[in-house]
């Protein structure tokens, strides 16, 4: 069942990206439904471009889209956080039922499902919000790269159709990417090489690729990642999560100590 769900999720994700991978010019005469969605996004950005400032339109529309998707993001992050919290216990179960013996695999799956139910965790709850978000964000990205009237104009003296010659936007995009990834991983129960690599590799990739992208696209990346930093600090603040976790450990330790003291007193009375 687990493998089927993973495969289904992968198919949905791949399908979304394949549908959105066209590169040709998009206009009001474009034939496909996807291109009409992309064009609708572009017209919305144009409508928000007060004083014909496409850069301002990109910023406002990106903020609106990210704000609308905040509940989905919050659902995704809370589910991921719950999964992180029970990871140590899941590893203990995997040690208890090692190997690929069918009986062990069945017992492992049963105990994992019982744990998920007891903790109110759905291991796939973080996948569905992501699958909904990706096509929306990809449509916004394609609106900036495939619709002609969004490729022109300036923003703070930057030509939106050209790479930023001062490298200000690429640096900001990389910085906010780093901050969002670092904050997301800071509260992880268990750190691993993959998380560490993601924290540093993703900003580097964004930085390098931004040197050659049009400033309008990099402006979108910058605003989107800056908003994500705001979302994390507002809804899933890692410092608060760590504080709550440490408090829970402290309370559990004090309870354990009280139980031990009570047992010692009871033992002395019996003597």
UniProtKB/Swiss-Prot annotation:
Record localization: Cell membrane
Chain residues carrying a lipid of type S-diacylglycerol cysteine: 21
Record flagged with keyword tRNA-binding: no
Family matches, as PROSITE patterns: PROKAR_LIPOPROTEIN
Entry superkingdom: Bacteria
Membrane topology listed for this record: Multi-pass membrane protein
InterPro entries: YidC/ALB3/OXA1/COX18, YidC/Oxa/ALB_C, YidC/YidC1/YidC2_Firmicutes, YidC_ALB_C
GO MF annotation: an example: membrane insertase activity
Function statement: Required for the insertion and/or proper folding and/or complex formation of integral membrane proteins into the membrane. Involved in integration of membrane proteins that insert both dependently and independently of the Sec translocase complex, as well as at least some lipoproteins.
PANTHER family: CYTOCHROME C OXIDASE ASSEMBLY PROTEIN COX18, MITOCHONDRIAL, OXA1
Listed name of the protein: Membrane protein insertase YidC 1
